[in-house]
Amino acid sequence: MTEADEVLVRVRERADRAFARADLTPGMTFDQVVHAVERALKIRLRVVREADTSGWGTLTGFLTFFADRREGSIHVRAADAAIYSQFAASHELGHLLDDAHCSGALHERSSVSPHDNPLLTTPEYEAELVAEHIAHRIARLLYTSPRVAESSW
């Protein structure tokens, strides 16, 4: 097994645990997914659609979390289509659900490997991959039903 294979196994295992932690089920709406994460983690969350994102560059969303207050907010671009901003928010939900949380540095991107950015460590890269896997699973849960497919026609 290669190192990349080992990373992928760890990422999938963490994503499975994270997804199970929230007890997400098919047919949920995005708001229900957010509430399920709140219940699972015993926190309060807000998803904020930010109007002024001129300084964000390629950033599609970010998470702020205050452990002492058990509350956080996920910020996404208001200009993005709902399906896109929900995916960005789902990525941030993935960070919350992951048992090895990311460091939250803004320069960390799931599309950048530790080989391309020496400041990004393998554990940080894995945390980004876990969040992406969770976001994709949430998207499948939300958008693969006939109800959603028909509403996009």
Give the positions of each predicted feature.
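Short, well-structured alpha-helical patches and their helix-loop capping segments
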Residues: A81, S85, A89, P123-V130
